[in-house]
Regions:
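Conserved S-adenosyl-L-methionine
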Residues: 168-178
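Conserved N-terminal segment of class I S-adenosyl-L-methionine
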Residues: 1-96, 100-104, 117, 215, ...
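A short glycine-rich, Lys/Arg-flanked "PGG" loop and its adjoining helix->strand segment in the class I
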Residues: 114-129
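Short, glycine-/aromatic-enriched active-site segment of Class I SAM-dependent methyltransferases
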Residues: 13, 130-152, 156-164
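A C-terminal cap/extension of S-adenosyl-L-methionine-dependent methyltransferases
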Residues: 180-254
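Short conserved AdoMet
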Residues: 58, 77, 111, 125, ...
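Residues lining the SAM
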Residues: 104-107, 133
Length: 254
């Protein structure tokens, strides 16, 4: 779950205007639009934070959120969202409840990711879908992973294997941040070799964590990277990009 996962309350940053979040959202929706068969699904957003994805996921049905941090839950409830307090490892829902489950940048925060995937399978309806986004490539591990309390980054093979063990069948698996990957990988490897840490200081509290991580990029850079995200999302509607800093996976319970 997201007890240490960063969140983005409205007074800190608008995620829809930040290139990283907007690019992930567009890529995700572009892939889902070609797979989700109808618009009246029961949807669960695991580790939903303050509910920043609710208005996007609402195009596919009625959304319920699961979060274990009371602070973002309070923000979500002020927005009028249905968010339940609970753990991803022990979800407070009946079996076969949801046709669509999302866990967006969640499982890397979980010590027992297999238990989380098993719970997703339990509450997923037959024929339902599980959508996961998560950081890619353990060799890209950096100080940013540490300050965000990640346990791991994933290879495509590892994620496929863990989903299969939980009972899911992968329908699509693609990488995102394809176009920024070469520069990002180069900078991370240089920092690893020199023992440098990024400019972001390790936060002292959860409140500091999301404010530090969500520090916006400069408007010109943000605009360019947002445009790159539009191009990538268009491509992802048709093809699975072979490399990137993150993974987007859509798996089915059959």
């Amino acid at each position: 779950m997201t007890q240490q996962h960063t969140v983005s309350p409205p007074h800190v940053i608008d995620e829809d205007k930040h290139w990283w979040f907007s690019s992930r959202t567009r890529a995700l929706l572009s892939m889902l639009d070609g797979i989700v068969p109808r618009r009246d699904n029961r949807i669960l957003d695991v580790g939903c934070g303050a509910g920043n994805m609710f208005h996007h996921l609402g195009r596919y049905g009625a959304v319920v959120g699961l979060e274990n941090n009371p602070k973002p839950i309070a923000i979500a409830q002020k927005r009028g969202y249905d968010v339940r307090l609970g753990q991803a490892e022990d979800m407070p829902f009946e079996e076969r409840t949801f046709e669509l489950i999302t866990a967006l940048d969640v499982i890397e925060h979980c010590a027992d990711d297999a238990r989380v995937l098993s719970e997703c399978y339990r509450v997923c309806a037959p024929g339902g879908l599980l959508v996961i986004t998560t950081p890619a490539h353990q060799w890209l591990w950096s100080h940013n992973d540490e300050i965000n309390h990640h346990f791991r980054r994933y290879s495509s093979a590892e994620l496929r294997s863990k989903l299969a063990q939980a009972g899911f069948h992968v329908k699509r698996l693609a990488f995102n941040n394809f176009f920024v990957f070469p520069l990002a990988a180069m900078l991370i490897r240089l920092r690893q070799e020199r023992g440098d840490t990024p400019d972001l200081a390790a936060p002292d509290t959860d409140d500091d964590a999301y404010q530090v991580e969500m520090e916006p990029t400069s408007p010109p850079v943000n605009a360019v990277l947002t445009g790159v995200g539009w191009v990538e999302a268009t491509l992802l509607h048709w093809v699975n990009l072979p490399v990137g800093t993150g993974i987007i996976c859509i798996a089915a319970k059959e």
